[in-house]
């Protein structure tokens, strides 16, 4: 029985719009059960084929050339049946997974509504409040609960999208074959805390259906060899219908926790706290830890009694249509949609969630997209919409201002430095290219980045607070996504977006919690004065990725984060940006759209300077250099003592020009123009460093020179590889 929609005087306001999952979890459980029955029939046929193969060909009844050919053909059919078993296991576990997600979301939302309703009852009976105060308090509570429910629906939609490339758990096939019939779902009836809920365990009566084949089944196995009756002798197998009750025991945490939330009405201000039934998203039991989950789970005696009866048409019934099994993407083929077609996942997200929009399919040049994915994963899917997609979308709608981010020579704020040591700094050296800044999979970005270091708008802070308790049940995943959303909002703040044509940031988070960012300008470009938090990676400055791969993604930040994840063998969970920035791209994963009130007034973040991000060894060397030895890091001063003419405004305008084009190959023109700007900025920084009289100003100029030296060298290598 599916979880019903909460009722109450304020329930509708807490649920509409977009605060309730309209999908029916029982539909998915029923489909999983139907496919489980198909799996049992396929397994019966498979066991019969194996038995007959061993009896005829291995028992010596038939030998010779014709026998070998027939043996090979039958072996091929057996392999096909095993493959079909794997497909069915994928479909069954996916349907149960989606049903569990829907169940969990509904029960969490029910908890929120019930807790808020109890708090409202307290407020309505509070004699210390006047009518206006009571009305205001109730409205704020209803609004906060509605926001939490909408966020839960959005989070569920994201997790449904993540299941596009669903892979069944280990030993899933063995577990399914041991059940004989799928276990009834454990439905957490948190919404209506009535004592009638224990009646749900009565559903295991359905396992009685496997008992019906047992009387007729032993009759047919007697026909083969005397050893065959051993299979019918497993009348102990009827006990296996009891095993659906045992899978219920791993799921006991789900019904147990529903009882506690209604009893404990404490802290209803954060109605998401009772959300503890986390085991529900994975309803499939895993009691049998068999070691090998591959496509050879040979369980000869599983459905023995009913198997040998009719190997051709099991049960005499029309064979169910099992085409949906092929729709589940195979684990080894994640990138079949890279040619520009639409990618069909097993389900669609709830489009009522305002903050998550399903990834739209868009035309992508197949060759270019495939070239951007060095490891063969689905990196290019829709990442670059060829000619018609204005990749200068997002911030690209701003009018060209012709203003370059010019750094003045009287900067007073020095970058964060460690205490200078007394040693003599070595002479200037070329930028290091051997530094490999690989993502640390052992800890995600949220483990090392305090949220207080990221600016956040009041509206976003309120939403995060409302959903904090609900996300606590999956601590790492929720925190990483919440942190990534805040970073994306800060990068889109007005003080981080100077209105340069086509310049915008994209933020992505992986399934293991890593956060990577990319922008549409140059390579390793970070605007002056901007800092990135620790454990946040810049895709175009990754030393491990070949420079030609990085260059292919220039001006296309969505493609850049996809290529970064593919190179490091990671899976993207979501891509975050504004609606305009994500409109013409298909990242192949969930899109999280930033709302206008998500973006803070200031995007100033505390973390690493741009030199520390792109060249950590040079930043460390600069920090260890005393003020008296700063010039040792630079080449000799130019012979001409006159300052070079500052042409950065015009050069910046030139690098913006390619961003107005949607033609293929605009990235090469942009990189050439950006290289000219970087070289000129390096020349100006060198002159400023040699002529500065203040140590703080000189240190800033040296940092600028080291940064632009690195960027110039990177662009030189990229352009050389492209030519």
From Swiss-Prot:
Q: Where is the composition biased (Basic and acidic residues)?
A: 432-444
A GO-annotated cellular component: cytoplasm
| Name of the coding gene | espK
Compositional bias of kind Low complexity: 200-209, 230-249, 309-319, 393-404, 412-426
Feature: compositional bias, Pro residues: 210-229, 250-265, 274-308
Organism of provenance:
Mycobacterium tuberculosis (strain CDC 1551 / Oshkosh)
Source organism's superkingdom? Bacteria
Q: Where in the cell is it found?
A: Cytoplasm
This protein's major location comes to cytoplasm
| Keywords assigned | Cytoplasm
Please explain the role this protein plays, according to its UniProt record: May act as a chaperone that facilitates EspB secretion through an interaction with EccCb1.
The reply to whether Cytoplasm figures as a keyword in the UniProt entry is yes
Sequence segments annotated as region (Disordered): 175-360, 393-451
> What protein name does the entry list?
ESX-1 secretion-associated protein EspK
The major lineage groups are: Bacteria, Bacillati, Actinomycetota, Actinomycetes, Mycobacteriales
């Amino acid at each position: 029985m599916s979880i019903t929609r909460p009722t109450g005087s304020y329930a509708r306001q807490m649920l509409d719009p977009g605060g309730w999952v309209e999908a029916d979890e029982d539909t998915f459980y029923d489909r999983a059960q139907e496919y489980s029955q198909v799996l049992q029939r396929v397994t019966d046929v498979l066991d019969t084929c194996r038995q007959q193969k061993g009896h005829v060909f291995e028992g010596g009844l038939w030998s010779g050339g014709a026998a070998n050919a027939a043996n090979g053909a039958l072996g091929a059919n057996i392999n096909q049946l095993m493959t079909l078993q794997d497909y069915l296991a994928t479909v069954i576990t996916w349907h149960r997974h989606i049903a569990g997600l829907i169940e969990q979301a509904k029960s969490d939302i029910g908890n929120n509504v019930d807790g808020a309703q109890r708090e409202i009852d307290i407020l309505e009976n509070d004699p210390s409040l006047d009518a206006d105060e009571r009305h205001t308090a109730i409205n704020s509570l209803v609004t906060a609960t509605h926001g939490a429910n909408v966020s839960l629906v959005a989070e569920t939609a994201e997790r449904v999208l993540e299941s596009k490339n669903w892979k069944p758990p280990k030993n899933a096939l063995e577990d399914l074959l041991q059940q004989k019939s799928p276990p009834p779902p454990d439905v957490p009836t948190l919404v209506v805390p009535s004592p009638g809920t224990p009646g749900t365990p009565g559903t295991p009566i359905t396992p009685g259906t496997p008992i019906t084949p047992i009387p007729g089944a032993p009759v047919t196995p007697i026909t083969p060899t005397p050893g065959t009756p051993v299979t019918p002798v497993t009348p102990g197998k009827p006990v296996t219908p009891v095993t659906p009750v045992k899978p219920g025991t791993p799921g006991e945490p789900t019904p147990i926790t529903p009882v506690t939330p209604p009893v404990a009405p404490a802290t209803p201000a954060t109605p998401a706290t009772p959300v503890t039934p986390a085991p529900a998203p994975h309803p499939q039991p895993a009691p049998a830890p068999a070691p090998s989950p591959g496509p050879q789970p040979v369980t000869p005696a599983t459905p023995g009694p009913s198997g040998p009866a009719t190997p051709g048409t099991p049960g005499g019934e029309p064979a169910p249509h099992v085409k949906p099994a092929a729709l589940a993407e195979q684990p080894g083929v994640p990138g079949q949609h890279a040619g520009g077609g639409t990618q069909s996942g097993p389900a669609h997200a709830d489009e009522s969630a305002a903050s998550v929009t399903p990834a739209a399919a868009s035309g992508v040049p197949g060759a270019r997209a495939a070239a951007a994915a060095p490891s063969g994963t689905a990196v290019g899917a829709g990442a670059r919409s060829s000619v018609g997609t204005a990749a200068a979308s997002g911030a690209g709608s701003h009018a060209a201002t012709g203003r370059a981010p010019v750094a003045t020579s009287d900067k007073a704020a020095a970058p964060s430095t460690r205490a200078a040591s007394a040693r003599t700094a070595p002479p200037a050296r070329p930028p290091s290219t051997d530094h490999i800044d690989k993502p640390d999979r052992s800890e995600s970005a949220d483990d090392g980045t305090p949220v207080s270091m990221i600016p956040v708008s009041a509206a976003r802070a309120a939403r995060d607070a409302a959903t904090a308790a609900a996300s606590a049940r999956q601590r790492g995943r929720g925190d990483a996504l919440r942190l990534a959303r805040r970073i994306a909002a800060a990068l889109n703040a007005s003080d981080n977006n100077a209105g340069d044509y086509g310049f915008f940031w994209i933020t992505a988070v992986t399934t293991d919690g890593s956060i990577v960012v990319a922008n549409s300008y140059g390579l390793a470009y970070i605007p002056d004065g901007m800092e990135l938090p620790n454990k946040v990676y810049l895709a175009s400055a990754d030393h491990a990725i070949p420079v030609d791969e990085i260059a292919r993604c220039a001006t296309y930040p969505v493609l850049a984060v996809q290529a970064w994840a593919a190179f490091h063998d990671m899976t993207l969970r979501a891509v975050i940006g504004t609606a305009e920035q994500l409109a013409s791209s298909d990242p192949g994963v969930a899109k999280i759209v930033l709302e206008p009130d998500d973006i803070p007034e200031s995007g100033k973040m505390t973390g690493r300077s741009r030199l520390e991000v792109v060249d950590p060894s040079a930043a460390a060397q600069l920090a260890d250099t005393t003020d008296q030895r700063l010039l040792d890091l630079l080449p000799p001063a130019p012979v001409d003592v006159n300052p070079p003419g500052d042409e950065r405004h015009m050069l910046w305008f030139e690098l913006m020009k390619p961003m107005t084009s949607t033609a293929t190959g605009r990235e090469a023109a942009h990189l050439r123009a950006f290289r000219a700007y970087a070289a000129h900025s390096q020349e100006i920084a060198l002159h400023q460093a040699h002529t500065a009289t203040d140590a703080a100003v000189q240190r800033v100029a040296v940092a600028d020179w080291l940064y632009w030296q690195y960027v110039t060298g990177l662009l030189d290598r990229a352009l050389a590889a492209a030519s």
